[in-house]
């Protein structure tokens, strides 16, 4: 296995864990900050919107940056956002920090997939992309339950420290293992969005959006939905998330 791809996958694991782990600590966040669960759930909304909306913008406007520099900058912003969340005294600070973390994720993820493809010969690019994306997939299976379990041992802030640590480890791995990767040929935002004019592409993306929106709307509030079954025990919830 190419260690360079594993370094990129580690960063994707951190980004994915941050996307999903809030589901396991949402009731704790709401109780700690004296807000409703629905308000605390905006942590997921702000992170997801920041991540989704800024990704194509950054990919277009930062295309002239060397890839490795952009990867490290993205992980630095991502870690900073999670550290602020871990220290945040109010819900306002939490939401602000989630935006920052989403910005870092938006800087990192598209760059990581493009870099993974650039590191592999043409006949192995699909395999390289699969390795990088596996970091994101494994975050659902392992990162989120583990982060929730860590939160159950202390408080929800420990979970954010865990995510920050994973992001920091990924940054060190990228710094040590990745070679310098030249900036890829630039494409304007209009060029990047041009495929959406094809109704087949647009419909496929809308279907994917609807499916994931429905799935993660349920997943985000899993801690509340299963509160009676888990007896409010976060470690039991972490086990359910692992099974899911």
What are these regions (language model features)?
Residues 20, 48-56, 140-141:
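Residue-level signature of mid-helix packing/kink "hotspots" within the transmembrane helices
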């Amino acid at each position: 296995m190419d260690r360079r791809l594993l370094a990129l996958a580690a960063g994707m694991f951190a980004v994915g864990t941050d996307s999903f782990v809030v589901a396991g600590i949402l009731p704790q966040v709401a109780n700690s900050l004296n807000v409703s669960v629905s308000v605390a759930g905006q942590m997921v909304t702000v992170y997801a919107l920041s991540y989704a909306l800024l990704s194509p913008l950054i990919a277009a406007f930062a295309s002239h940056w060397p890839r490795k520099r952009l990867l490290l900058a993205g992980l630095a912003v991502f870690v900073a956002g999670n550290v602020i969340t871990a220290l945040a005294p109010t819900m306002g600070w939490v939401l602000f920090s989630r935006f920052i973390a989403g910005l870092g994720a938006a800087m990192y993820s598209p760059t990581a997939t493009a870099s993974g493809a650039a590191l592999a010969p043409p006949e192995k690019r699909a395999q390289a992309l699969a390795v990088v994306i596996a970091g994101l997939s494994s975050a659902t299976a392992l990162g989120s339950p583990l982060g929730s379990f860590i939160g159950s041992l202390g408080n929800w802030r420990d979970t954010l420290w865990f995510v920050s640590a994973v992001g920091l480890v990924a940054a060190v791995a990228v710094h040590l293992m990745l070679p310098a990767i030249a900036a890829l040929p630039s494409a304007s935002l209009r060029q990047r969005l041009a495929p959406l004019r094809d109704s087949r592409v647009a419909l496929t993306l809308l279907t994917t959006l609807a499916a994931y929106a429905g799935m993660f709307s349920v997943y985000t509030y899993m801690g509340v939905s299963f509160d009676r079954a888990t007896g409010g025990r976060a470690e039991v919830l972490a086990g359910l998330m692992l099974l899911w």
